Amino acid sequence: MTNFLSSCIILLLLAQPAWGTPQHGLSLYGPQDLKYKPGQNYKYANPNAPKGGYLVLSDFGAFTKLNPASLKGVPAPDIGQLVFQTAMDSSMDDGEPFSQYGNLVEKVELAEDRLSMTYYLYKQARFSDGHPLTADDFIFSFNLIQDPEYHPFYKTYFKDIKSIEKIDAHTVRYHFAHYNQE
């Protein structure tokens, strides 16, 4: 959830010469500088990697909650990175430090006036229980962190997001409070 919303802010900060056109990713230097084409795997990822098995991790200390955003309790170490998937993510390739590619989103569109950004979700995106990911889930997550029971960091961090709008079941638009030149 936190990573998803972080992606929203990061994308706001990226300059995009092809504003108003849905793209599979965003780059500080424009879509022509994206290394990967739509549907292409990262060079360091194996699409045929074996699936299944166990992951066992250890850490010092104890935890009392699995929700890293709530105020009460101690979260499990790195739970946010292990459980939540971001809407977009960065390539780990050298020479591509400011590029974001769709992870849960097939396309992203930054408005020409940079006051809104639209995510076109992958229709195949699912939760671990098999339920489809929808625009309602993005809205729920955004509204959830506005709750006073959640850490005030999130409300402050995402204060530039004025509102979020459901366009259809698989499209969501973020409206920003003001133009941000960065």
Which residues does each predicted region cover?
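Short, glycine-/polar-rich solvent-exposed loops and beta-turns at beta-strand/coil boundaries
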Residues: 100-101, 154-158
